[in-house]
Amino acid sequence: MTESTSVVAPPPEIPNLNPSMFSESDLFSIPPLDPLFLSDSDPISMDAPISDLDFLLDDENGDFADFDFSFDNSDDFFDFDLSEPAVVIPEEIGNNRSNLDSSENRSGDGGLEGRSESVHSQVSSQGSKTFVSDTVDASSSPESSNHQKSSVSKRKKENGDSSGELRSCKYQKSDDKSVATNNEGDDDDDKRKLIRQIRNRESAQLSRLRKKQQTEELERKVKSMNATIAELNGKIAYVMAENVALRQQMAVASGAPPMNPYMAAPPLPYQWMPYPPYPVRGYGSQTPLVPIPKLNPKPVSSCRPKKAESKKNEGKSKLKKVASISFIGILFFVFLFGTLVPFMNVNFGGERGSFGGLSKYDGHRYYDEHKGRVLMVGDGSDVRRNSGISEGNIHSSRISHGERDSCGGVDYNAHPKVEGRPSSLSNASDPLFASLYVPRNDGLVKIDGNLIIHSVLASEKARGLGKKNITETVKTKEPDLTIPGALSSALAVPGVRGNAAMLPHSTALSSEGKRLHQWFHEGGSGPLMDYSMCTEVFQFDIAPGAIVPSSVSSISAEHLQNVTTHGKRMKNRRILEGLPVSLVASELNITGTQPNKDAQNKTFNGNTNKPTSSSSMVVSVLLDPREVVDSETDRVVPPNPKSLSRIFVVVLLDSVKYVTYSCVLPRSGLHLVAT
């Protein structure tokens, strides 16, 4: 066989046998028949709106995050076995097999693409045979044209008479058979897709049911809340109505004109029902919202007795309180005056007796314990008077000569009355026998107060009588003390014996007219102080008819203001306050020769030169406040015995005149020790 070298003419145009077939360009512009599931560009895309799966698109709260649509098996859609023959060729056209193979090789890529498109179109149509046949025809049209060209060239060489129309019909039938075999392999994929679609629909249905249940539950809760609100509103209305009724009752009880009472409803138990609140009037209406139970009106007069009773009860309670307070106050005063006052040392007119059933105080206790200063004054008679100050209290006693116990005590029953003077309770005009203890040179110095008083009396009498036998006169700005020669026997040199007993010298010393050199005595020798060291500071008379002071402490407080120049320190200028006295046993002994007792008694009793009509009393002995008062702290400080240089003595003369003397203490010499 020889091949013809003629030029192959193009085959005639074959009419379109399938009117529903579209071109490849038109296939992408027209949407698929079932747009609910698949689209043109992505057949298995889920972006298209799906009516049965709206919950996937409207899931704003993430309620359907549990549903998982996996596409792990999506590769099976494109897993085709290309080794199988695409077309079964009949035997009568077996000689054209080689040409078909070559044409298939040339259009291999296009055939695969058309085959995949036909498979996708078949899946999306859910078993629609019409759509599959249309897509198959549309996809196989380019292949048929290629086959026609090859067959025309073959026919011209072999048969030459065959027509291209018969060949195209045969090739079209073979393509239909190959598509049918491919559809059988894709049935499993369709089943899986259907199962997945059913599962998705079931999950969507379950989600809808769950939403419906939640909505019903919320509606039920809203209804219950509305019922509760209605119930509370009803209760509030009832309470408000009851409050209005109570206010009306209070207005009636207080006496205000009663308001028009509301009509009482029958007493029925109020049942709270879950209904909306009752409609009421506008704001400010006094109409009761609910029925008010009937209240029994109480008469106005019934409240008045209660008020009266309440007032009576209040008055009784107040009376009880006042009575209890007054009773407590009375008990306090009874305790104060009945218990505390008797312990205080009361001195009336120089006497201290029993008070409140307490025992009398023994004067000798002050001498034994040395808790205060002791003043002893004697005028030569048998009666002596002791005065002691301890812890701010003043004590005095009278001692008769020869009537003294072993301890120096006092017999209070032996108090003779003085003619023309008050009784023993007011015997402030009696002479006071005093001896003064003054701290000096780190010890206690005993000053004989008797000598001071006698020198004062001698000076006064010498001035009054104007006698010419004055032995010495010292003149300064202020009147000085003078001692007449006739009364020199009154200045007896003290001899300390026993409990501050005064022992003068013999009359032989006084008859010589010499000055006595000693007011202090230690060891029986040594000049310490004379009477010329005392100077009168001032004096004043008591008003005629005045009562003699019964307390020595009050007089000393009065004259304390005149002595000092600082009036604001009155409470700190008692010299005998706060000054401790400590006498040890070694200081209670004295050395030296003492005159015999007979000479002493003779001197005391035989002194006829001293007038007996005059009386004197040492009221107080003061220290210089400039030496014992601290100017910064305004407090009394214990003085330094070495720096103490001056004392002040206040003497009461004949109960009509107070005289204050300033006595200068010696700066050198032996310090005195007294028993």
From Swiss-Prot:
GO MF terms held by the record: DNA binding; DNA-binding transcription factor activity
Keyword Membrane: yes
Induction: By heat shock.
Chain ranges of the bZIP domain: 190-253
Glycosites: 427, 469, 562, 589, 601
Topological domains, Cytoplasmic: 1-323
Biased composition (Polar residues): 119-151, 592-612
Keyword annotations: Activator, DNA-binding, Endoplasmic reticulum, Glycoprotein, Golgi apparatus, Membrane, Nucleus, Stress response, Transcription, Transcription regulation, Transmembrane, Transmembrane helix
SMART domains: BRLZ
Membrane topology: Single-pass membrane protein
Chain positions covered by the region annotation Leucine-zipper: 229-236
Role this protein plays: Transcriptional activator involved in ER stress responses. Functions as a stress sensor and transducer in ER stress signaling pathway. After proteolysis by SBT6.1 (S1P) and S2P, the N-terminal bZIP component is translocated to the nucleus, where it activates the expression and production of ER chaperones. Following ER stress, activates proteins involved in brassinosteroid (BR) signaling, which is required for stress acclimation and growth.
Subunit structure: Homodimer. Hetereodimers with BZIP17, BZIP49 or BZIP60. Binds the CCAAT box-binding heterotrimeric factor composed of NFYA4, NFYB3 and NFYC2. Interacts with SAR1B and STL2P. Interacts (via C-terminus) with MED37A/BIP1 and MED37B/BIP3. MED37A/BIP1 and MED37B/BIP3 dissociates from BZIP28 under ER stress.
UniProt name for this protein: bZIP transcription factor 28
Organism: Arabidopsis thaliana (Mouse-ear cress)
